[in-house]
């Protein structure tokens, strides 16, 4: 039967619950545990798909097309054998929607629908379903203890601990142990009060993860244990690390996995973390440095491009290179030519995905620079669409545009997906008036690469599967004139024959793809497309 580890956070947000939980999952997996992870978000949005990247950061897309919290990206990157799906992330909005739909269908037989038991029962059912078929399920609760939005989730966890018993449920709580410079010491009082807040709603943590930017003394560890009713060995010190991939080793060296196995009655071999040691060694000891200029409109919040940032890091690890990302505001680049110096200093240029017209001319300016100056270029999603528009305008000399930016354009080289097949194979009509959450091409889909193309050489295969998140596609009637002018279509979707990628044969490295390869990159091996891109950047840097 599945065993559950619930993860909460206290004192402040952004302590790294997702990374810590994923690191623990990686250690358990290294011991042979079949482990999965789930994120519960207290906000009322049904999913993060239509939320602003400035507020929420990246939307991570799963294989089955769910638009989820960026923490699920961490989960997949730390785990080898468990892929996330729509059952691994749910919000208060989704829970309330499900309960209200049941009420409308009469499933509650006219009873009064309340937070307890109806909302909490729905939360519990989601948690149990997400853990089916696994040895251990790690459940992260978003937000901070004390937030009013989190209370139904906390109550559901309390009930599950009672119902499952000590041998099937544990609570791990992350807290901050701040360092007070004027006093020259770390303070335990915030942690004590955070646990007090938990206990006031009926929850007693079994494990405390104490985050700090300074060393926490053994005396303070004993003090925390004494005043929180947690075993001293279960008070785990987790100081700031040079690399997040050091965290599995940090947790293992403090015997956290042994404690969990003992509590759950699991007799397992020792964890083999040698892969993580190799990752950390390569990351912290690079042999070269390359700079990638990332031109986007959400650059004020790097988390908006979290998976791309990580994919570049992974490629750097693969090539023992320190990949520095120089973020360039696409909107500023439109009118500020002084930013061209950043493009000039870059060893490669990347234009990521995005929505809307704002900043597109700045991105096109960057693409033109990469094409004309033989700088390695990688376009992702919108980065591919704009590469096609740029080439059509400046090489074919036609006034091409996307119908996303100009509904009345005479040359719609990029157009809306107006018809689509759902998972049952039924035709779904989509238009500009449809709900934003229902007009997307989402999830893992197969693509067929043209034999002999650069992309086929990069992947070492002619058939690939990558994840999508977009509404607009390249218009196939422009394929022939583009190819006659030198831009090659190197990949098509397997079923709909939609354009998946383009490249330039007369350019050292110019590849643009409609899909999102960053979602499947791993620190242990990277991703072939990003690996090739960073290698091209290294070659460009060395040839300067």
Curated annotation (Swiss-Prot):
CDD domains: CTPS_N (cd03113), GATase1_CTP_Synthase (cd01746). L-glutamine binds at residues 354, 382-385, 404, 471. GO terms for molecular function: ATP binding; CTP synthase activity; glutaminase activity; identical protein binding; metal ion binding. Allosterically activated by GTP, when glutamine is the substrate; GTP has no effect on the reaction when ammonia is the substrate. The allosteric effector GTP functions by stabilizing the protein conformation that binds the tetrahedral intermediate(s) formed during glutamine hydrolysis. Inhibited by the product CTP, via allosteric rather than competitive inhibition. The active site is at 381 (nucleophile), 516, 518. Residues 291-543 form the Glutamine amidotransferase type-1 domain. It comes from the Bacteria. HAMAP family: PyrG. CTPSs have evolved a hybrid strategy for distinguishing between UTP and CTP. The overlapping regions of the product feedback inhibitory and substrate sites recognize a common feature in both compounds, the triphosphate moiety. To differentiate isosteric substrate and product pyrimidine rings, an additional pocket far from the expected kinase/ligase catalytic site, specifically recognizes the cytosine and ribose portions of the product inhibitor. Belongs to the CTP synthase family. This is CTP synthase.
